[in-house]
Regions:
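Alpha-helical transmembrane segments in inner-membrane proteins
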Residues: 2-247
Length: 247
């Protein structure tokens, strides 16, 4: 009886300590992320000092304009706020989304090495995007490219196809799902390489995009991707308990 009370008391003490530790870790990582974004903004063909980046943010932040004013050229201000800042934010946002998606895959397949390549999701997205460009469907509508839409369609169709192939009766064995995904991923990768050989000029339009380049990222790209990333993250968070049980 005494041992049970003691263990319960220790658990109550350890829970707040763990929570406090995790909060401190998250705070430290958040500060590190902000610093890395600021540093990355100053790196490029036209280098900008760290202090100048800070001054631009202080001068252009609502509520701080009246408190801070620094004589900064309009060229540096435009370069930071209109070109490099959206790229840095989009890179951080995409990195967070990939981390969340990777965690979900690892929990779903009970494998710490699982990733979007496991069931062909990435190769399906690449095939959808390149097919859109090759067929002349990679247009821009209201300032937003349709390539991400076709990439999403290709990804979703591939996942559903792999799931259907792997289904045995009313069950989907994890091993069969993984093997089917790897096979489909190799097949679609070969098709994308075939596009590169047969249509080199058109493929060049999407080559850097497939490698994850943020060279042409603008604010509209960030705002168009934000709802999908937040929505997907919320859905995954709602199934956190189920993923923990699977893992």
């Amino acid at each position: 009886m005494l041992n049970n009370l003691k263990s319960g008391f220790v658990k109550k003490l350890s829970t707040p300590r763990k929570t406090k530790t995790w909060l401190l870790i998250l705070l430290g990582l958040s500060i590190l992320l902000i610093c890395s974004i600021i540093v990355s903004i100053g790196v490029g063909y036209f280098p900008i000092p760290f202090s100048t980046v800070i001054k631009v943010f202080l001068t252009n932040t609502p509520g701080l304009k009246s408190l801070f004013y620094f004589p900064i050229s309009s060229t540096e201000t435009a370069l930071i706020l209109q070109i490099r800042f959206p790229r840095a934010l989009c890179a951080a946002l995409v990195g967070a989304a990939l981390s969340i998606a990777g965690t979900a895959y690892q929990g779903l397949f009970r494998n710490p090495m699982a990733d979007p390549y496991t069931i062909g999701a990435s190769s399906g997205a690449a095939l959808g995007a390149t097919s859109a460009v090759i067929l002349g469907l990679g247009i821009t509508f209201m300032g937003i490219s349709t390539r991400p839409l076709f990439a999403f369609i290709g990804c979703l169709a591939t996942v559903l196809g792999v799931y259907s192939i792997s289904r045995v009766g009313n069950k989907v064995p994890v091993q069969t799902l993984l093997l089917s995904g790897i096979a489909v991923s190799i097949l679609f990768g070969a098709i994308v390489n075939g596009y590169h050989t047969l249509f080199p000029d058109k493929f060049r339009q999407t080559a850097f995009w497939l490698m994850g380049s943020f060279s042409y990222t603008e604010w509209i790209d960030l705002w168009s991707a934000l709802p999908f990333i937040i929505g997907g993250s919320i859905v995954i968070y709602m199934f956190t308990r189920d993923l923990n049980l699977l893992a």
